[in-house]
Amino acid sequence: MTKIYDAANWSKHEDDFTQMFYNQNVKQFWLPEEIALNGDLLTWKYLGKNEQDTYMKVLAGLTLLDTEQGNTGMPIVAEHVDGHQRKAVLNFMAMMENAVHAKSYSNIFMTLAPTETINEVFEWVKQNKYLQKKAQMIVGLYKAIQKDDEISLFKAMVASVYLESFLFYSGFYYPLYFYGQGKLMQSGEIINLILRDEAIHGVYVGLLAQEIYNKQTEEKKAELREFAIDLLNQLYENELEYTEDLYDQVGLSHDVKKFIRYNANKALMNLGFDPYFEEEDINPIVLNGLNTKTKSHDFFSMKGNGYKKATVEPLKDDDFYFEDEKEQI
């Protein structure tokens, strides 16, 4: 039988939220070249050897995860999701992961470090067993998706939400730690822009996962929740070791582990599950770095949150009131 091909009809909503996510993704689109990084050089020269080493490695680890999410994760999930608009949003997000986020880290490297050091840190990525393990676990679930199988797709979506809303944050911690102290500010602006993107990526894929989950029997729901918690624990145990490997030399492992647990709970909430870890106080310096309200900076030195594109507006809780959005439509 000849296959009938249909076109994407953007004049008709596929659901209550996808076009809103499309609009938000487009509104906050940015490019690495829009952020000048030379202003970080003076601070960088005064950092200790261990501080520079940890900073380079956390960004290299983030680069690997963004590369795999852009090249493998989002495209595979998009392939198995129904709906042209949903596929478009996922593919837009995939583009941001590698072409924008990963490239941004390379721009930071090229500004702060010589070629030899950059090559060494990318070799470290291939050799670090904890980093490789989490990449293997996540990518393995992407590649395990079976055609017309919602359960394997749900599991891959859980992995995607964990990557975007949980695993990235051991790497985000250190740039935010400096940013919250007013150091390495240009690099910190890039991290805040990436955080803004990852926030909506995690929420969107989480909503798609919840659709699948909510269609299941109570017995199947229990099984899927058990899978999600088991995967969380496996990733968490590996993340603890990864954190010690990176942050022991700068004395911040204890703080980073709190931040990891905080974001693991956020990832679970994106999936519609209750928090798993107890609530803890997060380092106020890092929370200050996470404050994405508009900052007053010189127009020509920074883009980030202090630079106003005509079409960009900061992400707010109101952006996720889907019922209100539907009524307006």
From Swiss-Prot:
Pfam families attached here?
A: Ribonuc_red_sm (PF00268)
Per its record, the protein catalyses: a 2'-deoxyribonucleoside 5'-diphosphate + [thioredoxin]-disulfide + H2O = a ribonucleoside 5'-diphosphate + [thioredoxin]-dithiol
Identify the species of origin.
Answer: Bacillus subtilis (strain 168)
Positions that bind Fe cation 1:
66, 97, 101
The record describes how the cofactor is bound as:
Binds 2 iron ions per subunit.
Q: What is the annotated quaternary arrangement, including any partners? A: Tetramer of two alpha and two beta subunits.
Keywords attached to this entry:
Deoxyribonucleotide synthesis, Iron, Metal-binding, Oxidoreductase
Function summary = Provides the precursors necessary for DNA synthesis. Catalyzes the biosynthesis of deoxyribonucleotides from the corresponding ribonucleotides.
Name recorded for this polypeptide = Ribonucleoside-diphosphate reductase subunit beta
Residues recorded as binding Fe cation 2, renumbered to this chain, are 97, 164, 198, 201
- Record's note on what induces expression: Part of the probable nrdI(ymaA)-nrdE-nrdF-ymaB operon. Expression is constitutive but low, dramatically induced by thymidine starvation which requires recA.
Q: Which cofactor does it need?
A: Fe cation
Spell out the catalytic residues.
105
Q: What lineage is this protein's organism placed in?
A: Bacteria, Bacillati, Bacillota, Bacilli, Bacillales
Q: Which GO terms describe its cellular component?
A: ribonucleoside-diphosphate reductase complex
**What family, per the record?**
Belongs to the ribonucleoside diphosphate reductase small chain family.
EC number from the UniProt entry: 1.17.4.1
